[in-house]
Amino acid sequence: MRTAMRKLLLSSLITVTAISGIPAVAHTPYQQIRFADTSLEAGAVSCAQLTQLRQPDLRIERATSVAANSTWDLASLMTTRVEPGFCRVEGSIEGTIDFEVWLPLKEDWNGRMLGTGNGGFAGTILTNGLAHGVQRGFATSSTNTGHHDWEQNWAVGNTRAQENYAHRAQHLTAVNAK
């Protein structure tokens, strides 16, 4: 029964993305974001100030400075030490797409961004990809693709959840992370 449901779900997702003519995601251009006397563009904003960011459909839940050489639990399988310090940003887009962005300190940043995946039907943010990226100097993002792994029927009859999983969540996370 589970195999049949998975095949049906996969078939539905492929059909939705392949033949439905889903339009490209419309998106409002961002304005320069200012915090008191500093701006993000100047690189002078503290990690904690990122919670003040206001954009349509974007909510920053937490922005936490993480000390260098911190130990992280990687998907409950193992732990690793993340050598550089970084800013851990946790938030949501449109209320259902959870994401994290790990921002290296200015002196450690290579000037590039890395969006990580999570495999399978997703539903969780895997910190191993985030740790891997930030240790190499990338501003690194990950998303749960719009649902939680404990939700068994997240896509049944929910076209928006299927679209988020298929492509929107990755796109919106990348756009907002930048």
Question: Positions of the model-derived regions?
Answer:
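Catalytic-loop region of hydrolases
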Residues: 26-112, 128
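Cap/lid segment of the alpha/beta-hydrolase catalytic domain
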Residues: 110, 119-178
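Bacterial N-terminal signal peptides
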Residues: 11-20
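Bacterial N-terminal signal peptides that target proteins for export
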Residues: 2-12
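Alpha/beta-hydrolase
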Residues: 115-117
